[in-house]
Curated annotation (Swiss-Prot):
ATP binds at Q88, A105, P106, T107, G108, S109, G110, K111, T112. The lineage of its organism: Archaea, Thermoproteota, Thermoprotei, Thermoproteales, Thermoproteaceae. Its EC number is 5.6.2.-. In the N-terminal section; belongs to the DEAD box helicase family. DDVD subfamily. This is Reverse gyrase. InterPro entries: AAA+_ATPase (IPR003593), DEAD/DEAH_box_helicase_dom (IPR011545), Helicase_ATP-bd (IPR014001), P-loop_NTPase (IPR027417), Reverse_gyrase (IPR005736), Topo_IA_2 (IPR003601), Topo_IA_cen (IPR013497), Topo_IA_cen_sub1 (IPR013824). Modifies the topological state of DNA by introducing positive supercoils in an ATP-dependent process, increasing the linking number in steps of +1. Binds to single-stranded DNA, transiently cleaves and then rejoins the ends, introducing a positive supercoil in the process. The scissile phosphodiester is attacked by the catalytic tyrosine of the enzyme, resulting in the formation of a DNA-(5'-phosphotyrosyl)-enzyme intermediate. Probably involved in rewinding DNA strands in regions of the chromosome that have opened up to allow replication, transcription, DNA repair and/or for DNA protection. A motif (DEAD box) lies at residues 211-214. The gene is rgy. Residues 825-1223 form the Topo IA-type catalytic domain.
């Protein structure tokens, strides 16, 4: 038979039995379900073949789903006139599966059309539907379109409409029909729900669609409860869900208040209640709810959690993290009103003018009228004015530059708004008074001033920033608490905490401004301005949120991308503008202000207008998908390893919607040209079981039927989960089962009564709905193997599965990866499989021998582990033979340390005198070290930070997945052009152009790997401030150790891009009774260069010369013991191990108690057990575990990775070695 690369247990998509990789790669079920020779090009053909053989089992649900989808797709095409595209296909797939969901898609993606067709499809099947629109005009338009569609589709439809545009007679007739239940569909507005809910509640609706979720909340948040009841949710279920939500709210407040006892109580109570809720919901046959539109931040009421708790999804927010805006600025002239109107004339219609106060806005409108310009104010919503603006009758609208302004958040006209003008830099201006307190203003102030604070003041600022950030989601509750406190009303524990924090913030800011030294530092800083108006001090800081939201009106997502917009800031305050630029650049990598005079306005406006035309054509139906020849809104599922990475990626594109698939969270966002879902595999999804005897009997029987006897000579593949036949080798992988926080690879170990989490099934459940799956696992052989397993596991369900690779988790890197997918690299996969099989044969085999000989089941051995243990043992034993001493001497006021043998120490103790001679003094150029590789980072983490290697590796993983550093498993020192640009920005800003010296390092290295470096030009103090202030929002909470590790990565990288240092070096001979010791000391620095950031050669005082009396301060025997840092250096130098295994090897040695780790520098001292184990392995298996053989095997693996060695030949050689060197010992 043809040799499959691997076999997988429990993985046939149809029967759940074993299956080989070749079958999965062809999209086929196992050969038990379909015999060899079966051909299939799609899952539909597979299902047809299975049904013909009467073998259809696990794929039966897919058959029903595909049938429903095809019926819906044909129905859609018949009515609309063209096929569904991108996002519509995704929504249709969910709809026919009876799933409720949020529609995450931009203007022109066909949301309303889909909702109307889904409504007709439901009605055709005898189901009842309810459509809710935000306005009467939209409801009327949808109703008319629904009737047109019904006529086209030949659907007999009883449709009702109720809204304010109807006549009184029409309203009466509609209500009477509603009373009689004589309808299939009701089209109405969000205002109708609370007014007529008693009437509506008589009916259960099978399909409910809300065209604008935000409008539902504006009417009343209780509309959420009402919609759920209309879907069939009982009062009991609703009340249970509300209890869960209330407990969640209490839990968060208890966490904010620091009440740990209450947190624990609420946590336990909530877990029980959630389990009860899940049981109740499963008993109900609920209708389908489709929530269209995003939520304004202010609308994110906790009642929205009802959707998550009952329907399994969460509604997302607006994609304000996406922008395609040209940011320009110009200095304010003496007459800013005339300057503004001149800009309006130059830029044309479709403008918004943001002003700091109403008085200036009204003056601009009045002067515009005098000049014949059609400009109106929009300080409050004015429907007629907005409609005139949309029709092009007004050139611009004037509104307040505030995040609460109707023109900043309450307007979305992507086909109309072309540009915005900020008359003055948007800013917070406040006096430090309790009654003027604002969380955003104080957060901005504290973040911007922390850089001029030191010691206790900075600590207090950071603490307050953290407390205010945690209170920010409860801003309204905080204001209510302040009001209650001022009135002397009774306060809850949360109220008291909020009031205490606010008072502390106001008092602290006051104390800063009253401190003359700090006030002067603030006044001379470039981030905060203090202004004196009518004798009172005001604080001025940039309002970045308003700028982002306001300028974002010009750049909106639509079905085709992100429209281009223009923003012009008339700068009235250079200092506040500088702070605005700085913070904007930290939030958006691409953001950069250019002077208006340097911009090509004609080209910019041409690009802006091209997008507006496209948007209008889509909105008015003149541009259908086929006209472009491309699928504008493709649907993508990206699978990464960790939930942290998944959340980080999703958050690049706005506040994601959330879907829960069998306990696995999937984050959904729109990128403009795609609907992107991101989820995590939780690491590897397959592993070799410890023995085939420990898997399900049926699985084992099927394998035996295919491969025959598992034995091959004296080798029994059942013991190693690797089947060996004359025709080749077949590793057998089992699913990794997750149950109650534990992980299992053997079936028999799963606890009774526990239904394990099947990650692959959860991902399959979502993958079947999308067009494309992208596998975004780590860029190394381990990540490639995970991608390979996912590819095979999903292949029967999805035709288009590709691999994406990124070495940093940044928005730029993710977009580049999305645009450049590739296939799975089978050379990397094969190398990883060989490593795993080699470890199973050699490591597992040697471990069994050790366990038998030493009668200890906890012992282990491995090819890499053993020579590393040997270095530790040999070094330690050598130190016992040749004893030397560290001696610390004091001569005059200078201390020196020497290393001397015992006889010299005896002379020194007796005479207490040394002779010191200055041999030479020279200036020496010291070049910076290259940026970190994995081993170097771990060495410094151990030596400088006192962290263990495995803990440092976990911290680095967190930093990578949070988007703060590049990939941390690397042996490359190469720096990309993007990395050099980051270094340039930081170094020039901090130290000037002259210190910057770009180096790409590692020019001769192959591949795309790069050194470990930061992804942004922000040092650790800036990072701490940005995280505390909420400017940078991460998926995890950073600890002190995270910051420490980031700091050394940042400093090392920046140093690698700086000028060399020039130091003064003194060379001495120290003579003790004829024994001469040579010393070198750096005694001065002529030019700091890179050592400004990264001290490589600390300066020591010069030594006095001549014959000197000394005081012996201390001495001790030097036991030459390797530290973790020393071992890491040896592993890299001698080619033993890989970046991904360095820390793991050290961890295993300590875990098995072969060494114990002690001290800040993590010295590795061999134990008696460790020494005995090494001696045994060296004597019995010296050749097998020798350093040379281990290095050669590593070279084999590397050669497989790059396609220079054949997988089959290497694994055959390893098997031969195992059979000759290890197997005889096991047999005996």
């Amino acid at each position: 038979m043809e040799v499959p690369l691997v076999a997988y247990l429990h993985s046939c998509p149809n029967c759940g039995g074993p299956i080989t990789s070749d079958r999965l790669a062809s999209g086929l079920p196992c050969r038990e379900c379909l015999p060899d020779g079966a051909k299939a090009g799609s899952i539909k053909q597979v299902i047809t073949a299975l049904r013909k053989r009467k073998a259809l089992q696990g794929l039966a649900w897919v058959e029903a789903y595909l049938r429903g989808y095809e019926e819906f797709a044909e129905f859609f095409k018949r009515i609309v006139g063209f096929e569904m595209w991108g996002a519509q296909r995704l929504w249709a797939r969910r709809f026919v599966r009876g799933k409720s969901f949020a529609i995450v898609a931009p203007t022109g993606s066909g949301k309303t059309t889909f909702i109307l067709i889904a409504t007709l499809y439901s009605a055709k099947q005898g189901k009842r539907a309810l459509l809710i629109f935000p306005t009467s005009a939209l409801a009327h338009q949808a109703y008319k379109k629904l009737l047109t569609f019904a006529e086209r589709g030949g659907v007999s439809l009883k449709a009702l409409a109720y809204h304010s545009l109807l006549t009184e007679r029409e309203k009466k007739e509609a209500l009477e029909a509603l009373e009689r239940g004589d309808f299939d569909v009701l089209v109405t507005t969000s205002a109708f729900l609370p007014k007529r809910f008693e009437l509506l509640s008589r009916y259960k609706f099978d399909f409910v669609a809300a065209d604008d979720v935000d409008s539902i909340l504006r009417a009343t948040s209780k509309n959420i409860d009402r919609i759920l009841r209309l879907l069939g949710v009982s009062d009991a279920v609703l009340n249970t869900a509300l209890e869960v939500i209330n407990l969640t709210k209490q839990l968060r407040k208890a966490e904010v208040a620091g009440d740990l006892k209450e947190v624990e109580r609420l946590d336990q109570e909530m877990a029980k209640l959630r389990a009860k809720l899940r049981e109740e919901v499963q008993r109900l046959k609920l209708g389908v709810f489709v929530a269209s539109g995003a939520l304004a931040k202010a609308r994110r009421t906790v009642r929205l959690l009802l959707f998550r708790e009952i329907l399994g999804f969460d509604v997302g927010g607006r994609a304000e993290g996406l922008r395609n805006v040209v940011d320009l600025y110009v200095e304010a002239s003496d007459n800013v009103i005339e300057q503004t109107l001149a800009l309006v004339k130059r830029l044309g219609p479709g403008g918004i003018i943001y002003v700091q106060d109403r008085e200036l806005g009204e003056a601009i409108v009045e002067r515009a009228r005098e000049a014949g310009l059609a400009v109106e104010h929009f300080f409050r919503p004015r429907r007629g004015v907005l409609e005139s603006f949309e029709r092009g009758e007004l050139a611009a609208l004037v509104g307040l530059a505030s995040s609460r302004s109707a023109l900043v958040r309450g307007i979305d006209l992507p086909h109309v708004i072309r540009y915005v003008i900020f008359v003055g830099v948007p800013k917070f201006k406040f006096r430090v008074r309790l009654e003027e307190f604002s969380i955003p203003a104080y957060l901005t102030f504290l973040y911007n001033v922390r850089s001029v604070l030191a010691g206790d003041a900075r600590y207090k600022a950071d603490r307050l920033i953290g407390q205010l950030k945690r209170l920010a989601p409860y801003a309204l509750s905080v204001q209510e608490a302040l009001k209650k406190a001022s009135e002397g009303a009774e306060l809850s524990s949360f109220d008291r905490h909020a009031v205490d924090v606010v008072k502390s913030a106001v008092e602290f800011v006051n104390s800063l401004l009253q401190n003359e030294e700090i006030r002067k530092a603030i006044e001379t800083s470039s981030e905060v301005k203090l202004a004196y108006i009518d004798g009172e001090m005001y604080v001025l800081v940039p309002d970045v949120t308003t700028y982002i939201q306001g300028s974002g009106r010009t750049s909106r997502l639509y079905a085709g991308g992100l429209s281009k917009g223009l923003s012009v800031v008339i700068v009235d305050d250079p200092k506040v503008f500088h702070a605005l630029k700085r913070e904007l650049s930290l939030r958006f990598d691409e953001a950069e202000f250019k002077h208006l005079g340097e911009a090509d306005l004609d080209k910019i406006l041409a690009d802006v207008d091209r997008d507006r035309k496209t948007i209008r054509d889509i909105m008015e139906g003149r541009l259908v998908p086929a006209a472009r020849g491309v699928d504008l809104m493709r649907t993508i599922l990206m699978v990464v390893e960790s939930p942290t990475k998944a959340r980080t990626i999703a958050n690049f594109f706005g506040r994601p919607s959330l879907i829960i698939s069998e306990g696995i969270p999937i984050y959904e966002v729109s990128t403009g040209d795609a609907v992107l879902m991101v989820t995590a595999s939780l690491g590897h999804i397959y592993e070799l079981p410890t023995s085939l005897n420990k898997i399900d009997q049926r699985q084992r029987e099927v394998l035996a039927k295919w491969f025959g006897d598992f034995k091959h000579g004296n080798y029994d593949g059942e013991n190693y989960a690797v089947i060996v036949k004359e025709y080749g080798f077949v590793p057998v992988y089992n699913k990794i089962w997750r149950c109650r926080g534990a992980v299992y690879v053997d079936d028999i170990d799963i606890p009774p009564g526990c239904k394990p989490l099947d990650v692959l099934e959860a991902i399959r459940n979502i993958a079947v709905e999308v067009d494309t799956v992208l596998l975004g696992t780590d860029p190394d052989s381990e990540g490639e193997k995970i991608a390979f397993d996912l590819y095979l596991g999903l292949r029967p369900y999805v035709q288009d599965i590709r691999r994406v690779e990124f070495h940093e988790v940044t928005r730029r890197a993710i977009l580049n990866a999305l645009a450049n997918p590739r296939g799975v690299n089978f050379s990397l996969v094969k190398a990883q499989i060989v490593r795993r099989v080699e470890d199973r044969w050699i490591g597992f085999g040697l471990s069994k021998i050790l366990q038998a000989n030493f009668k200890n089941p906890n012992l282990s051995a491995g090819r890499v582990q053993t020579p590393v243990l040997g270095w530790i043992v040999n070094t330690y034993e050598e130190s016992l033979k040749n004893r030397v001493y560290n001696v610390e001497l004091q001569l005059n006021d200078v201390d020196i340390r020497l290393q001397v043998p015992r006889d010299v120490l005896d002379v020194l103790r007796k005479k207490k005198r040394v002779a010191i001679k200055l041999v030479a003094r020279e200036r020496r150029q010291v070049n910076p070290p290259p940026p970190y590789t994995t081993d170097e980072l771990l060495r410094d983490a151990v030596n400088k930070l006192g962290l263990s290697a495995d803990y440092a590796m976990r911290l680095a993983q967190d930093l990578f997945e949070s988007g703060l550093i590049t990939y941390h498993r690397t042996d490359s020192t190469r720096v990309s052009t993007a990395g050099i640009a980051i270094a340039r920005e930081y170094i020039v800003r901090k130290f000037g152009e002259g210190v910057f010296k770009p180096r790409s390092w590692g020019e001769a290295e192959e591949g795309a790997h790069e050194a470990i470096r930061p992804t942004r030009p922000i040092d650790v103090e800036e990072l701490r401030g940005l995280v505390n202030a909420g400017v940078i929002q991460l998926a995890i909470q950073l600890t002190k150790s995270h910051y420490q590790l980031y700091d050394i990565i940042f400093r090392r990288f920046m140093a690698s891009q700086m000028e060399p240092s020039v130091v003064e070096v003194a060379k001495y001979n120290v003579e003790i009774d004829g024994h001469v010791i040579q010393l070198e000391r750096t005694v001065g620095v002529a030019y700091m260069g890179f050592q400004t950031l990264y001290q490589l050669t600390p300066v020591e005082p010069e030594l006095p010369t001549g014959t000197l009396d000394v005081v012996i301060k201390r001495y001790r025997v030097v036991r030459r013991v390797l530290s973790q840092a020393d071992v890491l250096a040896l592993m890299r130098q001698r080619g033993i191990g890989r970046p991904s295994t360095y820390a793991h090897i050290l961890q295993v040695l300590a875990k098995r108690y072969y060494v114990y780790v002690t001290g800040r520098t993590k010295l590795m001292i061999p134990t008696k057990r460790g020494r005995e184990i090494f001696r045994f392995l060296k004597e019995a298996f010296g050749k097998l575990v020798s350093e040379d053989r281990t290095r050669l095997i590593e070279q084999y693996m590397d050669a497989i990775e790059v396609g220079k060695a054949r997988y089959e030949e290497v694994i055959a050689e390893l098997y031969d070695e195992f059979r000759k060197e290890v197997l005889p010992h096991l047999a005996s």
